[in-house]
A protein has these predicted regions:
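Short glycine-enriched, charge-decorated loop/helix-capping segments at active-site entrances
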Residues: 143-147
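Short glycine-rich loop/turn motifs that provide flexible caps or phosphate-binding loops at active sites
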Residues: 3, 10, 177, 195, ...
Length: 379
């Protein structure tokens, strides 16, 4: 979207990837410097509101979620507000728990819309980028989500569009993917483990995956998985193994998908249209890592949409009460049932589910979006 380049050139090969030198899987990094290539907003007076890879971006105004972390393991939820608009004072605290997790819903999107409208009116940027996440939630929870969610995000978008028109700006709507119904999960790392290719370490907090000691493992991201190999001579063996697994549509070389980047896996697995990849690598839930039952987007070695669900409200209320009383505890309320997930994305699908641009003389191909914005900016 921002560069007009393919992932092979801009380097963002997924929501996370394996860092080979440190032998760590890193998910949901936010440094803008991870994006390789010129972004269309460089050299333009820009406001970036909750856009991904927002930290340290070369823009004049921005806001992004970022908790404070204490040395005792405590966490205080907050945002980085670099808008000079004092957003929390005017709008109240950002509703972090509705941004992601079992309570993810409308309040976070409404707050972002209101914040963006305020920045538009007060700062009048040449360009503003605003991410409204609301449709990501129920369209992953359910195969047939209520269309009320569309009407809700439409009202939030209206808040931003009204503010844009007040400063004579042109509103553009862009979506990088469409969520499709799914009915089955493929635990690709369990397949690799059962074949003796994936290594784990057992300990007091469950089994931990050891990427650096594994012959093969997968970093999963919705319907796509990067498969990393310790030795590329294993390529044919692993490809045959995974292609024989139910729910896997294809296993290809990254160059075939414009993913030929140093951060990419040695193979790319694609799910069937009605399937998605779970990151699960343990073979018995009794030995699942302690973070598996929590919302922990940075520690999990793969994307986990089960974080949108909850085991039971009673258990969650008990954990909240324990936290308020000062007990040291973990919020282990996330189910280990990948079959709950109702929607996913990542494949090239029908036109109804592909990337979308709405605006005057909008391009049909998403790779033309950066060039389109530059043209609107007169660059």
């Amino acid at each position: 979207l921002l560069t007009g380049l393919t992932p092979a050139k801009h380097g963002i090969v997924g929501n996370g990837w394996y860092e080979r030198e440190s032998a760590e899987v890193r998910f949901w990094q936010q440094s803008n410097r991870l994006i390789q290539g010129e972004k269309f907003y460089e050299g333009v007076q820009t406001a970036k509101m909750f856009w991904w890879f927002n930290q340290h971006a070369p823009v004049q105004w921005s806001a992004t979620p970022k908790p404070h972390y204490g040395c005792d393991g405590s966490k205080v939820f907050d945002i980085i507000d670099q808008t000079q608009c004092d957003l929390v004072r005017h709008l109240g605290p950002f509703p972090f728990f509705s941004f992601w997790g079992p309570n993810a819903g409308l309040p976070a999107t409404q707050w972002i819309a209101d914040a963006t409208a305020r920045v538009l009116r007060e700062k009048r940027p040449e360009l503003a980028l605003c991410y409204l996440p609301h449709l990501d939630y129920d369209f992953q929870r359910y195969q047939q989500p209520s269309m009320d969610r569309v009407r809700e995000v439409d009202r939030c978008a209206g808040v931003v569009i009204d503010a844009a028109r007040q400063i004579d700006a042109i509103p553009i709507v862009v979506s990088e993917y469409g969520l499709v119904p799914v009915k089955r999960a493929v635990a690709i790392n369990r397949v690799l483990r059962q074949a003796g290719l994936l290594a784990v370490r057992s300990g007091p907090f469950g089994e931990m995956m050891l990427p650096g000691d594994s012959q093969a493992f997968a970093v999963v991201d919705h319907q796509v998985a990067h498969v990393y190999l310790a030795d590329r001579t294993l390529r044919s063996e692993v490809q045959r193994l995974l292609e024989g697994e139910e729910g896997v549509a294809a296993v290809v070389c990254p160059d075939e998908l414009n993913l030929g980047h140093a951060r990419s896996g040695d193979l790319i697995a694609l799910a069937q249209p009605d399937a998605w990849f779970s990151y699960y690598y343990w073979l018995d839930d009794r030995f699942a890592p302690d973070f598996a039952r929590t919302v922990d987007i940075h520690r999990k070695p793969g994307y986990d949409p089960c974080e949108l669900f909850i085991t039971s409200k009673a258990r969650a209320m008990m954990r909240v009460a324990q936290k308020k009383l000062g007990f040291r505890m973990k919020m282990d309320v996330i189910p280990l049932d990948a079959g709950l997930v109702g929607g996913s994305h990542g494949l090239v699908n029908t036109p109804d589910h592909n990337p979308l641009v709405i605006g005057p003389d909008a391009p049909e191909d998403i790779y033309g979006f950066a060039r389109y914005v530059r043209r609107l900016l007169g660059r």
